[in-house]
């Protein structure tokens, strides 16, 4: 898999634990910061899932 986890929205990918996943929007990747999180979000962590609009994020809501 691409180390940058560039995958389509709603798709699935297998990110490595060291992957930053900044461009990943797939539903299966929950290893790192969501692309929808604002810059400097202190709560970007595992389990973060983007929902809908770019400002709707489960870890930064």
Curated annotation (Swiss-Prot):
A divalent metal cation 3 binds at residues 15, 19, 24, 29. A divalent metal cation 4 binds at residues 33-34, 44, 48. Residues 1-29 are annotated as: Beta. A divalent metal cation 2 binds at residues 7, 13, 15, 26. The modification Phosphoserine is found at residue 58. GO terms for biological process: cellular response to cadmium ion; cellular response to copper ion; cellular response to zinc ion; detoxification of copper ion; intracellular zinc ion homeostasis; negative regulation of growth. GO terms for cellular component: cytoplasm; nucleus. A divalent metal cation 5 binds at residues 34, 36-37, 50. A divalent metal cation 1 binds at residues 5, 7, 21, 24. PANTHER family: METALLOTHIONEIN, METALLOTHIONEIN-1G. Class I metallothioneins contain 2 metal-binding domains: four divalent ions are chelated within cluster A of the alpha domain and are coordinated via cysteinyl thiolate bridges to 11 cysteine ligands. Cluster B, the corresponding region within the beta domain, can ligate three divalent ions to 9 cysteines. This is Metallothionein-1A.
């Amino acid at each position: 898999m691409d180390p940058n986890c560039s995958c389509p929205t709603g798709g699935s990918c297998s990110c490595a634990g060291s992957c930053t996943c900044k461009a990943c929007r797939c539903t299966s990747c929950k290893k790192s910061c969501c692309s929808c999180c604002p810059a400097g979000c202190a709560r970007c962590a595992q389990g973060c899932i983007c929902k809908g609009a770019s400002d709707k994020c489960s870890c930064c809501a």
